[in-house]
A protein has these predicted regions:
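Conserved ABC ATPase "signature" region
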Residues: 98-102, 107-122
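Catalytic Walker B motif of ABC-type/P-loop ATPase nucleotide-binding domains
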Residues: 151-155
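Helical segment within the ABC ATPase nucleotide-binding domain
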Residues: 165-178
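Hydrophobic anchor residue at the start of the ABC signature
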Residues: 140
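ABC ATPase "signature
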Residues: 210-211
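Conserved ABC transporter NBD signature motif
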Residues: 58-66, 73-74
């Protein structure tokens, strides 16, 4: 049984249709990508999955729970790093982790988590003094501190230099290798091709294709995921 199931999801804001008849599923232990340009409905979809927004229609199941009705129980089993989340500049790294750990009944050991993510030396540094890559490592640590079964990572590498992006990719793979299922939201084609076992391509609030990167390339008759995306979204 899939860990995440979405069926015919729809969400509007006034006259604007943000998500329109979206369906997909995520299997245990995979990195599943939600790929699309800005405004495609990616973030709205994952916010609905976390119980942060209420869809107009459709059904969702995350770890066998309804995000709308069971959001308190779901928060104990799902970790998230959202696109717009940001810590105060004057909070220290260990203070942020201790704060987030206090939200969970059985949190991870924060010292071990800092060590695994290469943040031990930054433990007493203020968040505002960290590099972009270090801030993203902290974001991943906060998403993992509750020992989640599913981690939602939204536009994780936006604004990072190429070296920091590749370091972050390795961390995401490490997270998956510990048994955590990852829902990765991105607009970077190379990131999706490198990391995702399967993915859903979003365009104008709809899912236009799902599959492995190789399946999507083959379906479009293209040699790269970038070219396949352009073809499948009708932009060529």
């Amino acid at each position: 049984m899939p860990l995440i199931e979405v069926s015919n999801l729809r969400k509007t804001y006034g006259e604007h249709v943000a998500v329109d008849d979206v369906s997909f599923h995520v299997e245990q232990g995979e990195i599943f990508g939600i790929l699309g340009t800005n405004g495609a409905g990616k973030t709205t979809t994952v916010e609905c999955l976390q119980g942060l927004r209420t869809p107009d229609s459709g059904t969702m199941s995350v770890l066998g729970l309804d995000p709308g009705k069971d959001h308190t129980a779901l928060r104990q089993r799902l970790g998230s790093q959202l696109q717009e989340s940001r810590l105060p500049d004057k909070i220290k790294v260990h203070e942020a982790l201790d704060l987030y750990a206090s939200f969970y009944a059985n949190p991870a050991d924060t010292g071990d988590l800092l060590a695994k993510l290469g943040l031990t030396e930054q433990r007493d540094k203020y968040f505002g003094k960290l590099s972009g890559g270090q801030k993203q490592r902290v974001s991943i640590a906060l998403a993992l501190v509750g020992r989640p079964e599913v981690a939602v990572l939204d536009e994780l590498t936006t604004g990072l230099d190429p070296h920091a992006r590749r370091d972050t990719w390795k961390l995401v793979e490490t997270v998956r290798d510990t048994g955590v299922t990852v829902l990765l939201v991105t607009h970077f084609m190379d990131e999706a091709e490198r990391l995702c076992d399967r993915l859903a391509i979003f365009d104008a609030g709809r899912v236009v294709a799902t599959g492995t990167p190789g399946e999507l390339r083959d379906r479009a008759g293209k040699s790269t995921l970038d070219e396949a995306f352009v073809s499948l979204t009708g932009r060529d």
